[in-house]
């Protein structure tokens, strides 16, 4: 099965997961419910789970073949400290907290990749699935690194992604070098 077909077949489940996360936003270093959901899904798909890096961070490991090569795929999990005024069914149920930057979608997208990789394993190497806390307030990546992320899970490259509402559906954008990264840390 092709990736697009697989994702399309999982669309309803992925949307439900994103909506569940959206309805229960958690601020930086408070992503306990989200981390529990991520760990439960990864475990369900047979992916070994490592918790506690950076406080509430979650790491899943998908291996196949004999290569020592490894890449990381990263999604941020935290919400923003702002009130949601949307009225749809999955609007925030927590006053003063909202997934306004799309991290609920980022988690759902990385979970989709995790599920596909776990079920198809058509690669040679290791994929480290990094669910990072506290991106908005800062410090989540730093704390995961302090807790030994790169020592425990050596990787040749780490890829993060971010939704971009102005980009047409089905489009993909890339740029050489860092994008949307803080230049002062």
Show the residue positions of the predicted features.
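Acidic/His- and Gly-rich active-site-bordering loop/insert found
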Residues: 1-99, 108-111, 115-116, 120-123
